[in-house]
Every structure is written in C-alpha cells, then in structure tokens.
C-alpha cells in the first residue's frame, strides 16, 4: 500500500510535464523532470511534506526543495524557497519539521516552525553546524532529541579534533591517499579514513554527542530505504546497525546494537547470527524490535527474514521467510 501511494503521488507530481505540446520523449525531458520523494504525513494526517529536485541542465546541477500538499488533495506548494532543502521529517507535535540543507557550512540539520492551520512555515533556524556535516536526521518520539549521521575521523573524540584534521587535509599540497585496507570507496566516494557515526543533539540546540565512537561504520553503508537506526518509543535508547568484523569488506555480518541516548557501552543483540541483521524498528509499546535478517554469511543476495527481538527475554522469533517486495526493504 505504501509503495502504491508513493507511485501515484510521484505520477501526479510529474503529470503536468506530459500535458504540454506532444513530442518524442527525449533524454533531456527525462532529466528535466522533478524528482519527487521522501513523502511524510503530518502527525494530524492533514499534510504531506515531500522533496522535489529541480534540474538545471545548462548548469549541470540538481537542487532539492521541500514541498507540501494537503493529504485530502489539492495544489502542491514549494514550502522553503531561497535555499536547498531535503529529507523533511515531522516533529511528533506537528508544529515543527526538520530538514537537511547545505546553505551554511555544508549539509546541516535545520528546523522549520509550521502553522498547521495555514500550512505555512513561520520561521526556521539552523540546528547543527558540525564541521564534518550532517545527514539522516531523526526525531525522538518525545521530540526532545534529534539523531543524525556524520562522517568523522574515528580517532577524534570531539569536534575540535575533526575540524583540525579537515583543515590539515584541505591545506596539504599532497592530495594522494594511501589505503591499507578495504573498503576504501563506495562508488565514486572515497572514505578518506573516516567513519559514519550517529550523533544526538537536543532539539532546542546544543553540542552534538557521538553515540557510536570507534573505528566502525555505524550505521553501515546502505543503498537506500529504511534507516538502519531507530529510537525506542520512550526516546531513551538507540538501536543501530554496525559491522565489527576485522575484514568487513568480505563480510555481511551486520549486527544490531543498542545503546543509551545518554551514552555508554553498546550491546550487540544479534551476535549469534553470522549473517546480516538490519533495519531495526521498535514496536509502539517498546517491548520488541522488528528487523530483517539473513542466515547465509557473506551472501548479499540471501533472502530476508522478518525477525522479532523480545527486549525483556532477549529471545528472537522468526515471523516470515520470504523474498522482500521491491522497495519495501522487508518491513511494510
């Protein structure tokens, strides 16, 4: 049902392009279409935020913007103008939403104040200004905190250290890099000795804290879909995916880890499975964690099983064993 909604939503948004003068569909036509995605329904069910990418073929550039449309139907409107804006995420109270923007200091988390009666933004401000940039923001269920991911130097324990290493790398005349292990690149993006870590920051502002320190990617690299990290319903715990194998490039042993939002030692809750565990989601009552699991180590194309972890007994039960429908990531 969610896939059907997303498809129809995207079709309606691009339909006006095809209503213009008829001509053979060209590559330029395809590239000029607005790319719509990330639809999120407001807590009261009245509004849908989504992102749309504007393409400038002459400038060879793409710029995302946040749009809004009534969930009951109506005309869509661009909600944030004057700066790029992507990945909108509602606050639990529906009075604010977070989004990503590169207007100041690279990709950072911004907060917009929202008037639910008029469907307009009444103000906005930048929440983070971390030198290593931010992405993948996620509100806590109580609205007090926001998670985000930043690619940092694992040997650095604070922002000052990361800022210093970034400055040194920028000023260095030597741009060659030495790699002593895999993985050193995903597609065209070099890791440059950095790791993905999950940070938490108070929604009212403050210094971000690294919840997943160490020489590991947390979360692991993903091709899209469900975030590989989630808040518990009470907002006190984080569950995320990380691979701590020594030869991670040849391993699919992604595990689920839990850690307090206040910080501390993380606990591996899927250590017994040598294959991949991913895409955690807490049950609304907080008693369980649902997730995807494979059973064949080292085989990325192994089918996914829907598993449920009992937080009290620490027991796991297999709910399904099937090939996930495309686009669902196994969790519907």
Predicted regions and their residues:
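Bacterial N-terminal signal peptides
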Residues: 6-16
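Boundary at the C-terminal end of the N-terminal hydrophobic targeting segment
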Residues: 17-21
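Beta-strand-rich domains and repeat architectures in extracellular enzymes and scaffolds
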Residues: 28-64, 192-193
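Signature of short aromatic-glycine-proline-rich micro-motifs recurring in repeat-based ectodomains
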Residues: 35-39, 153, 199, 224-233, ...
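Hydrophobic beta-strand positions that form the internal "hydrophobic ladder"
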Residues: 45-48, 94-98, 146-147, 235-239, ...
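A flexible loop/linker signature enriched in serine peptidases of the S9 family
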Residues: 52-65, 79-86, 98-110, 129-135, ...
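Short loop/turn segments that connect beta-strands within beta-propeller blades
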Residues: 70-74, 113-118, 202-206, 260-264, ...
């Amino acid at each position: 049902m969610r896939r059907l909604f997303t498809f129809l939503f995207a079709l309606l948004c691009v339909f006006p392009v095809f209503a213009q003068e008829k001509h053979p569909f060209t590559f330029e036509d395809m590239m000029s279409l607005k790319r719509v995605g990330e639809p999120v329904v407001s807590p009261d069910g009245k509004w849908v935020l989504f992102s749309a990418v504007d393409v400038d073929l002459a400038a060879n550039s793409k710029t995302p913007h946040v749009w809004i449309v009534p969930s009951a139907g109506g005309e869509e409107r661009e909600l944030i103008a004057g700066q790029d804006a992507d990945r909108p995420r509602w606050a639990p109270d529906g009075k604010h939403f977070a989004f990503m923007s590169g207007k100041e200091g690279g990709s950072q988390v911004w907060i917009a104040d929202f008037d639910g009666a008029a469907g307009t933004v009444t103000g906005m401000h930048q929440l983070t200004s971390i030198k290593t940039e931010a992405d993948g923001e996620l509100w806590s269920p109580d609205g007090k905190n926001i998670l985000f991911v930043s690619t940092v130097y694992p040997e650095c324990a604070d922002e000052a250290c990361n800022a210093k290493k970034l400055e040194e790398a920028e000023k260095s005349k030597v741009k060659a890099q030495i790699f002593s292990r895999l993985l050193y690149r995903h597609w065209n993006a070099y890791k440059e000795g950095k790791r993905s870590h999950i940070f938490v920051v108070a929604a009212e502002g403050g210094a971000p804290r690294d919840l997943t320190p160490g020489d590991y990617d947390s979360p692991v690299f993903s091709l899209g879909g469900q975030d590989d990290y989630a808040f518990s319903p009470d907002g006190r715990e984080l569950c995320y995916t990380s691979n701590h194998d020594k030869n991670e490039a040849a391993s699919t042993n992604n595990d689920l880890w839990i850690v307090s939002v206040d910080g501390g030692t993380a606990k591996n809750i899927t250590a017994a499975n040598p294959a991949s565990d991913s895409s955690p989601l807490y049950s609304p009552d907080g008693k369980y964690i649902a997730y995807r699991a494979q059973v064949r180590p080292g085989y990325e194309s192994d089918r996914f099983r829907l598993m449920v972890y009992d937080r009290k007994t620490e027991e796991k039960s297999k709910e399904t064993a099937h090939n996930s429908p495309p686009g669902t990531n196994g969790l519907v």
